[in-house]
Design a protein with these regions (language model features):
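Ligand-binding pocket segment of bilobal, Venus flytrap-like solute-binding proteins
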Residues: 161, 168, 172, 177-246
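Early extracytoplasmic/lumenal segment of secretory-pathway proteins
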Residues: 23-88, 342
Length: 342
């Protein structure tokens, strides 16, 4: 009875007068990305490929739970979310399937997709050091590890340990430096907090610009939003900030990057259409749209970036396979708790 009721509900959610025609090509999407960051591409996809779409947006954890509950009755063909750790969680939950697609494998670097091809990165975001140009001499900055130096006591703004972006950063450091060294670093970081972690990356950047802290760890696209904001006070705040790329020395690992990404769901009924969508999302045109609209870095080598991203300069990115962010996530969360990172 439960499955029958669920099936009726799902049909009601997705059905339209034309959606039940067998001749229609359609792809059903569950997306944790905001509608504004996916809908324009879907409209272009429909126009170019002649494939209709049905889009459901929501919180990542809620959509993942929904896929688990729906099981084989799920209408979803594609799951889109942010953070490689979340994508790995979807894989571990058994709601995705492995896809051997030569176009995706050729377009997306191996480090930015699942080792077993359950999910694929669609755009990159760099989590780096952003500092107040008036209070910080950039020559004193060097690495993520250096932020634990007592010289920065009372000067660091950062999000809470609940932030999946911080969890993934710590997960990457565990892979490189090991648990013991990373925990020592996290304790040093906590001792340098300018204030208890609060708010999102935009709040941190505004606080840094206002002098409440000197440095912040944030995703670069948040700075891009301030730079291009329609609000004059936000544009003014951005003028006080600059990007520093850590861990750039020869032999060092580079800047921590993460992805937004997608996978084909385990019970997808429209696999051909789902793959067509994923292939479309890694065309140069789609990649450049993400770069321009949300200031995210392309995953496809050679795709153009926005003027805003170009103004941040070039950097060497960490090349570890992002699958490890999900694998190390439970360890990272426990480590952050032990270190007092709330």
């Amino acid at each position: 009875m439960r499955k029958i009721l669920l099936s009726i509900i799902l049909i009601g959610i997705f059905a339209t007068p034309h959606s039940l025609l067998a001749t229609d090509q359609v792809v059903n999407i569950y997306s944790a990305r905001k509608e504004a960051l996916i809908l324009p591409l879907l409209k272009r996809f429909k126009k170019e490929k002649g494939i209709s779409y049905r889009l459901v947006t929501g919180k990542a954890d809620g959509l993942l739970k929904r896929l688990e509950i729906e099981g084989s009755l799920s209408p979803a063909d594609v799951f889109i979310t942010v953070d490689a750790g979340r994508l790995q969680r979807a894989k571990q939950a058994g709601v995705l399937q492995s896809i051997n697609n030569p176009i995706l494998k050729q377009r997306i670097p191996a480090s930015l997709r699942d080792r077993e091809n359950y999910w694929f990165g669609l755009s990159q975001r760099a989590r780096t050091i952003i500092y107040n140009k008036e209070t910080v001499d950039a020559t004193n900055l060097s690495t993520y590890e250096g932020l634990a130096n007592p010289a920065w006591k009372g000067q660091l703004c950062i999000r809470s340990s609940n932030s999946v972006y911080n969890q993934s950063l710590v997960a990457s450091m565990i892979e490189v430096n090991g648990v013991e060294e990373t925990e020592s670093w996290a304790r040093g970081l906590v001792s340098n907090f300018a204030r208890p972690p609060t708010g999102g990356d935009t709040d941190l950047l505004k606080a840094t610009a206002a002098g409440q802290c000197s440095i912040a760890l944030a995703n670069t696209y948040y700075l891009g939003r301030l730079i291009n904001s329609k609000i004059s006070s936000e544009r003014k705040a951005a003028q006080n900030l600059a990007v520093f790329w850590p861990n750039q020395d020869e032999g060092d690992r580079g800047v921590h990057v993460n992805v937004s990404g997608a996978g084909v769901t385990k019970y997808a009924r429209n696999i051909k259409e789902a793959l067509s969508l994923l292939e479309f999302l890694v065309t140069d045109e789609s990649q450049e749209w993400y770069a321009e609209v949300n200031n995210e870095y392309p995953v496809v080598e050679g795709a153009e970036i926005s003027k805003t991203l170009a103004s941040f300069g070039t950097f060497k990115a960490d090349s570890i396979n992002l699958t490890i962010l999900g694998v190390n996530n439970p360890t990272a969360v426990k480590l952050m708790d032990r270190a007092g990172w709330r």
